[in-house]
Amino acid sequence: MSYSYQFLEEVAVADLAFDAAGDSLQELFQGATNAVIDALANPATIGSTWMQVVDREEADPAALLFDWLSDLAYWKDAAGVVFSKADVTLRQEQSGLWKLQAVLYGEPVNPSTQELRADVKGVTKHLYRVSEQNGRWAARVVLDV
């Protein structure tokens, strides 16, 4: 598995921006997911007492990534949790639709035992892009914090 992400301090002043990349679309999704998880809290300080299964479908992989990363912000607020990890599976159906199946793991927010970082409120369309070049996928994402 080969994915990466890098936070970009010079891109967004009041928000948090990152670039993610992967050798496949699956790896791009995992890298971008890990970037959001890492932006919220140090995953090494988060347990796995909470779990949520998420299924999503979209024709456009860029729209699917945007919606999925938005789901992370939603579940953080709706369940009052931060995440230790997410197992993400992505595949293209015969119909052409992209299907994401993910399992989020985490636990309720507890500042006394967790290294909390940014309060991510959502994903913005500002500078958002997903592209593929020579078999390598890349995304730029700006998070509203």
PLM feature segments, named:
Residues 1-145:
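Intrinsically disordered, low-complexity regions
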